Structure formats: structure tokens, C-alpha cells
């Protein structure tokens, strides 16, 4: 469900901000990186403790283009642990290049509290045929001013992040857990248009993400029981920058 905002532009139709997911506005989000873990065991655990959510496919394929400035300040802020901080991305699902439905997202973090503005876009023409300059100009034309300003500060496409994701939720829907694996990163720096050539794959990388209200930590532990993960920093965008050599090597996990 989205707001009834109706704005049209050449390449995109802005449907509006997703208001069906109130949990996106403010929530506590934690991540755990588990190299070479058995995805099947975690899937079985969550199928017993939670309910599976299916969005189009039982296993979603998520692809996001992250935008940053020329100095990669958003990436550096994450590496340095600076808070609050933001990330800007264009996301789509279940196709190698963008299809008819995309989401422009501004994600913010203040310590462990996070939130996300998620705007649904409908493509009026093939997005993969646009140059990045055209893509950014088209987004600027249709985005609300406060979101447009976030993109203007980050005018460079940096990394396309790709992974497979499985979704689970508590019985009441307040808590969510995702299993992310089969990660791949595509360097977008200096590219004229969206590039899916020469992926840098990390098949051993497995990420468990938990998301829910700040006051539901006990319930979250019950959802993951008997697994008691040690949560830590794990930005897929930052991992992509590190793996592609866009930032100096650093022990980031």
C-alpha cells in the first residue's frame, strides 16, 4: 500500500512512499556475519520459531545500487563508526537489471536505531538503457525535495550489491529476521550505465539480520533460540567497497 501521490516523469512514475511498512520508520537493527555457516540449519530453526514471508518468490534476489560522493564519505563514516549516518540506494528484486518496479531508499542509522524512507517507482522505459547521468537526472526530476537533496549529495554510483534473501517474521509480525547469502559486488565507478560485468563473489558470506522495535530484544532472542549470535558491524555496501579495492584494506566485520 502506498500513498496516493501521483507524480509523473519521463522515465519514472513516482507512486509514493510505502506506508504499509510502519516498521521501516524507526527500528532496532542488528546484524551477524557468519562465514561459511550452514544456511539450511538457520532456515530450519526459523521455520520452527517463526513464519516464513514470501515476496514474489520464496527466496528473493535483491540488487541495490549504492550512491556516494567522490570521496566515499558514506562508506568512510561506516568504517569509522560515525553516527548518525545515511546511505542512498536504488533497489529492485528478482531480475538482473531493473524491471518495472524499483525503490529509492534513504537509510539512516543512529547507533543501533535505524530507519528507512522507501519510495516506490514505476519505470516508464527500460532503466538499463539509461546512462547513469540520465538515471540520476530522472530521479532528481521526480523525487520529493528532501529526498532529492540526499541524492544530490551523493551523485556517484559506486557499487551494485546482489544477494539472495529469505524472510521470516514473528507471529504478530513485529519482529523480522532475514537470511542473506550468495553475495556479489559489481563495481560501478566510472561506468557509463548499470554494469553487471565481472562480479566479485563472496559465496562464504552469510548474514543474519534482525529487525524490530527497541523494546523487543527478549522476544528477538526467543525467535533465534538456541542460537545466540554475536552481533556486529556488517554493511554490505562497505564490504563491497573493501572487496573491490575502492577503499584501503581494513579489518571490517
Model regions and ranges:
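Phosphate-end processing signature that detects enzymes handling 5′-triphosphorylated RNA
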Residues: 1-253
Amino acid at each position: 500500500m502506498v500513498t496516493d501521490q501521483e507524480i509523473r516523469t519521463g522515465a519514472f512514475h513516482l507512486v509514493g512512499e510505502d506506508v504499509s511498512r510502519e516498521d521501516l520508520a524507526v527500528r532496532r537493527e542488528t546484524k551477524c556475519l557468519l562465514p561459511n555457516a550452514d544456511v539450511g540449519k538457520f532456515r530450519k530453526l526459523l521455520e520452527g520459531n517463526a513464519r516464513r514471508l514470501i515476496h514474489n518468490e520464496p527466496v528473493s534476489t535483491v540488487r541495490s545500487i549504492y550512491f556516494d560522493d567522490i570521496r566515499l564519505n558514506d562508506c568512510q563514516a561506516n568504517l569509522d563508526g560515525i553516527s548518525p549516518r545515511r546511505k542512498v540506494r536504488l533497489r529492485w528484486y528478482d531480475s538482473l537489471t531493473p524491471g518495472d518496479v524499483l525503490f529509492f531508499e534513504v537509510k539512516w542509522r543512529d547507533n543501533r536505531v535505524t530507519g528507512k524512507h522507501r519510495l516506490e517507482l514505476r519505470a516508464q522505459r527500460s532503466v538499463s538503457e539509461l546512462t547513469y547521468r540520465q538515471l540520476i537526472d530522472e530521479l532528481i526530476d521526480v523525487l520529493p525535495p528532501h529526498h532529492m537533496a540526499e541524492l544530490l549529495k551523493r551523485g556517484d554510483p559506486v557499487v551494485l550489491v546482489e544477494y539472495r534473501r529469505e524472510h521470516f517474521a514473528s507471529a504478530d509480525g513485529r519482529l523480522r529476521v532475514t537470511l542473506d547469502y550468495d553475495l556479489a559486488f559489481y563495481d560501478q565507478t566510472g561506468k557509463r550505465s548499470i554494469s553487471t560485468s565481472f562480479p566479485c563473489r563472496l559465496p562464504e558470506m552469510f548474514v543474519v539480520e534482525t529487525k524490530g522495535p527497541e523494546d523487543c530484544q527478549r522476544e528477538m532472542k526467543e525467535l533465534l533460540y538456541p542460537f545466540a549470535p554475536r552481533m556486529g558491524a556488517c554493511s554490505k555496501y562497505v564490504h563491497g567497497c573493501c572487496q573491490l579495492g575502492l577503499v584501503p584494506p581494513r579489518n571490517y566485520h
